[in-house]
UniProtKB/Swiss-Prot annotation:
Reported tissue expression: Abundantly expressed in spleen, placenta, skeleton muscle, lung and brain.
Protein known as: Transient receptor potential cation channel subfamily V member 2
Molecular function as annotated in GO: calcium channel activity; monoatomic cation channel activity
Region annotated Disordered, chain positions: 1-45, 559-583, 719-756
Taxonomic lineage of the native organism: Eukaryota, Metazoa, Chordata, Craniata, Vertebrata
One example of a Gene Ontology biological process annotation: positive regulation of calcium ion import
Keyword annotations: ANK repeat, Calcium, Calcium channel, Calcium transport, Cell membrane, Cytoplasm, Glycoprotein, Ion channel, Ion transport, Membrane, Phosphoprotein, Repeat, Transmembrane, Transmembrane helix, Transport
Alphabetical list of NCBIfam families matching this protein: trp
SMART domains named among the record's database cross-references: ANK (SM00248)
Quaternary structure (record): Homotetramer. Interacts with a cAMP-dependent protein kinase type II regulatory subunit (PRKAR2A or PRKAR2B) and ACBD3. Interacts with SLC50A1; the interaction probably occurs intracellularly and depends on TRPV2 N-glycosylation.
Family: Belongs to the transient receptor (TC 1.A.4) family. TrpV subfamily. TRPV2 sub-subfamily.
Gene3D superfamilies: Ankyrin repeat-containing domain
Record topology, Extracellular segments: 409-428, 477-490
Length: 756
């Protein structure tokens, strides 16, 4: 398989006269040059090369005035116009000069574009009559590096070939012609322009098959897979390890039009794969990050294609490709079985863990409310509720002890460790400090372990882990305050009370266990992160600027005895027994406190008579009131109202995401990690594979009420809703039920049906 990374074999080229271009190489470009432009000529900047001069000895090589001499400009002009008659004599010229069409003399300097690429770029009604003659001439010249597989060599278009261009031009005729003449169908276009990064780019999976699929050309896809010359492989991967299915997931953008096209192409490729290579599970192929197409959709936040893969249901010959099976239905009521492979947190790097901790999309909360994730997380939550409330009770007891100890703090002069004559209260106070220290160490280790496991996605953790960051700060303050307490440093007390305040604020973390308080907590978090932080940033800038200005003006005070129009700036020193009148704004802190009163509407514009520039001070105070009290506060209120309204539509799903994070944290908790994980669902037979082997899946039952598509007739696995008696149900053959295993009753159909 030819790859763009394989360097061509070295060959000494020939020169028969003055070559176009120069030896300068443009190194200052940060943008990709155009592959073909009617407004810009071909680049003449070539890399310096050593060549054999055929005119070194008189009589060798053609004359400079030879009318049959083919240079790059002449050749590019002929192929761009599509006039094959003007290629007459090209083969003889190449043989006479020992040249090939892939030599640097016939390629563009900046991109390495060949005459064949030039011809494909200038198709007329999908054809160019010069393509076949060029291929024949190149083959007859004995080129060791065939023109049909020549690639661009610059950093932006590296690996780009004529086959890629033909597919991009949507010319099936050209694709067939190139493949019939030996084009490599697995060549990779791996330049910067074809990689996913910020800026102008188009990532399609590098391979010709992926390009055809991403540009919605099913006829080209079919030909590449079924042609008799060199069929493309659905298992082929690009430099990132992505298959054509991964590439389709990457180009999805959640819009209705794009999603419909991507889903149709995705399903068609799966069905084609089932016919061509029935033993290969295309959706189980992982890229270099260990992600299948389903996991990649979860990580990138491609909601629509993610929904389709989870809920895909086929009938007939392609039923083994389904991930959803209708077990039983009656009118709009439907009992569905969802395949849990790669979904449940029982597996490593599962879809649930990716959505909760590794997803980059700001809309990932919309994925946890999709079935079967919604019911799966609810089942896990119901099983882990006792553990959640046990953690809540332990934390509440810890905070009560913390509060009692902080409330009964002795004077700073007393020693931290009581003497032998200490009272019972002093001993209990010391015990309380020890318990606080141990609790702080436990919280600190837990939060450090939380962020260490997410060190590769630390930015996502900081954006979403609101309470985890507060818990970390609380633990640091707690441990530091207790250390300072035992070394008898008085600064332990401010740190202690700060940790106490944070501790009670962090009690809101456990409100996510209840729907109403959890949604309310979500709104508070969003308002703080979106609006309040921006307001504080702008407000602190205003506050500092005006505070410095007022402090500077307050230093210029007038003597009380001097007339108001006096120009002197020196004040009389107070006599003995006479107190000096304080200036209104003696320092930045005092000025900031006074200005804060104006912000909340409690300030007074009255000021002492000794201020020299009273008019300027008055104008500054009025400007400050207008900018903060009138403008900033009202903008904050308006933005908070808008945030609450926008979050209200997604607050339920955001709360579900927070519950999912809590569920996974409890499953992966430090003290529970050694216990065997619970595996949801049941192992059952859902059909028969093409080779006659029973199709057994680990499935999860979900009851649904769907009035939108209830008239659609789907094959069912059972005639009645009784799940315990249907054929194909069996326990896990590899293990016996344990404490964490679900009982038979846990998997019976739910009694309460909820409409979605």
């Amino acid at each position: 398989m030819t790859s763009a990374s394989n360097p061509p074999a070295f060959r000494l080229e020939t020169s028969d006269g003055d070559e176009e271009g120069s030896a300068e190489v443009n190194k200052g470009k940060n943008e990709p040059p155009p592959m073909e432009s009617p407004f810009q000529g071909e680049d003449r900047n070539f890399s310096p090369q050593i060549k054999v001069n055929l005119n070194y000895r008189k009589g060798l090589g053609p004359s400079q005035q030879d009318p049959n001499r083919f240079d790059r400009d002449r050749l590019f002009s002929v192929v761009s116009r599509g006039v094959p008659e003007e290629l007459t004599g090209l083969l003889e010229y190449l043989r006479r000069t020992s040249k090939y069409l892939t030599d640097s003399a016939y390629t563009e300097g900046s991109t390495g574009k060949t005459c064949l690429m030039k011809a494909v770029l200038n198709l007329q009604d999908g054809v160019n009559a010069c393509i076949l003659p060029l291929l024949q001439i190149d083959r007859d010249s004995g080129n060791p590096q065939p023109l049909v597989n020549a690639q661009c060599t610059d950093e932006f278009y590296r690996g780009h070939s004529a086959l890629h261009i033909a597919i991009e031009k949507r010319s099936l005729w050209c694709v067939k012609l190139l493949v019939e003449n030996g084009a490599n169908v697995h060549i990779r276009a791996c330049g910067r322009f074809f990689q996913k990064h910020q800026g102008t780019c188009f990532y399609f999976g590098e391979l010709p098959l992926s390009l055809a699929a991403c540009t919605k050309q099913w006829d080209v896809v079919t030909y590449l897979l079924e042609n008799p010359h060199q069929p493309a492989s659905l298992e082929a991967t690009d430099s990132l390890g992505n298959t054509v299915l991964h590439a389709l997931v990457m180009i999805a953008d959640n819009s209705p039009e794009n999603s419909a096209l991507v889903i149709h192409m995705y399903d068609s490729l799966l069905q084609m794969g089932a016919r061509l290579c029935p033993t290969v599970q295309l959706e189980d192929i992982c890229n270099h990050q260990g992600l299948t197409p389903l996991k990649l959709a979860a990580k990138e936040g491609k909601i629509e294609i993610f929904r389709h893969i989870l809920q895909r249901e086929f009938s007939g010959l392609y039923q083994p490709l389904s991930r959803k099976f209708t077990e039983w239905c009656y009118g709009p009521v439907r009992v569905s079985l969802y395949d849990l492979s790669s979904v449940d947190s029982w597996e490593k790097n599962s879809v649930l863990e990716i959505i909760a901790f590794h997803c980059k999309s700001p809309h990932r909360h919309r994925m946890v409310v999709l079935e079967p994730l919604n019911k799966l997380l609810q089942e896990k939550w119901d099983r882990l509720i006792p553990r959640f409330f046990f953690n809540f009770a332990c934390y509440l007891v810890y905070m009560i002890i913390f509060t009692i100890v902080a409330y009964h703090q002795p004077s700073l002069e007393q020693p931290a460790i009581p003497s032998s004559k200490a009272t019972f209260g002093d001993s209990m106070l010391l015990l309380g400090h020890i318990l606080i220290l141990l609790g702080g160490i436990y919280l600190l280790l837990g939060q450090l372990w939380y962020f260490w496991r997410r060190r590769l996605f630390i930015w996502i953790s900081f954006m979403d882990s609101y309470f985890e960051i507060l818990f970390l700060v609380q633990a640091l303050l707690t441990v530091l305050s207790q250390v300072l307490r035992f070394v008898e440093t008085e600064w332990y007390l401010p740190l202690l009370v700060s940790s106490l305040v944070l501790g009670w604020l962090n009690l809101l973390y456990y409100t996510r266990g209840f729907q109403h308080t959890g949604i309310y907590s979500v709104m508070i978090q969003k308002v703080i992160l979106r609006d309040l932080l921006r307001f504080l940033l702008v407000y602190l800038v205003f506050l500092f600027g005006f505070a410095v200005a007022l402090v500077s003006l307050s230093r210029e005070a007038r003597s009380p005895k001097a007339p108001e129009d006096s120009n002197t700036t020196v004040t009389e020193k107070p006599t003995l027994g006479q107190e000096e009148e304080p200036v209104p704004y003696g320092g930045i802190l005092d000025a900031s406190l006074e200005l804060f009163k104006f912000t909340i509407g409690m300030g007074e514009l009255a000021f002492q008579e000794q201020l020299r520039f009273r008019g300027v001070v008055l104008l500054l105070l009025l400007a400050y009131v207008l900018l903060t009290y009138v403008l900033l506060l009202n903008m904050l209120i308006a933005l908070m109202s808008e945030t609450v309204n926008s979050v209200a539509t997604d607050s339920w799903s955001i709360w579900k995401l927070q519950k999912a994070i809590s569920v996974l944290e409890m499953e992966n908790g430090y003290w529970w990690c050694r216990r065997k994980r619970h595996r949801a669902g049941r192992l059952l037979k859902v059909g028969t594979k093409g080779d006659g082997i029973p199709d057994e899946r680990w499935c999860f039952r979900v009851e649904e009420v769907n009035w939108a598509a209830w008239e659609k007739t789907l094959p069912t696995l059972s005639e009645d809703p009784s799940g315990a008696g249907i054929t194909g149900y069996k326990k896990n053959p590899t293990s016996k039920p344990g404490k964490n295993s679900a009982s038979e009753e846990d998997h019976l159909p739910l009694q309460v049906l909820q409409s979605h």
